[in-house]
């Protein structure tokens, strides 16, 4: 059976607490066998230490730096663009940084 690769995309701006909670929930996922995910996060010019906190707590997150002019839509496109250049993913999951997920969310979405 081949692996299923999921790219999780987020855009953040000065919402460190919410973003860390979202990522914490995300990394507690119970995934189906042969399934993995990578997180691609656009930091659109955060000034509250969001990127630094993410890098410290979740070093595997791909952080793409914005300059504060991307806003959510362009930030999500930027994250998707980085993910699509990194590898071929079967699925792309767009999340808001204040999304709190259940441990079986990805598994249920794939079913």
Task: Describe each region flagged by the PLM.
Residues 35-45, 64-66:
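Short beta-strand/loop segment that forms part of the nucleotide-sugar
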Residues 88-98:
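Short beta-strand-to-loop acidic/aromatic patch adjacent to the donor-nucleotide binding site
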């Amino acid at each position: 059976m081949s692996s299923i690769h999921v790219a999780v995309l987020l855009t953040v701006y000065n919402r460190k607490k919410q973003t860390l909670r979202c990522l914490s929930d995300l990394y507690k996922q119970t995934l189906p066998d042969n399934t993995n995910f990578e997180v691609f996060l656009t930091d659109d010019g955060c000034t509250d230490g969001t990127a630094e906190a993410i890098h410290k707590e979740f070093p595997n997150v791909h952080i793409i730096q914005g300059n504060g002019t991307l806003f959510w839509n362009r930030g999500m496109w930027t994250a998707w663009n980085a993910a699509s250049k990194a590898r071929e993913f079967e699925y792309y999951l767009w999340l808001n940084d204040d999304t709190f997920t259940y441990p079986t969310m990805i598994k249920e979405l794939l079913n």
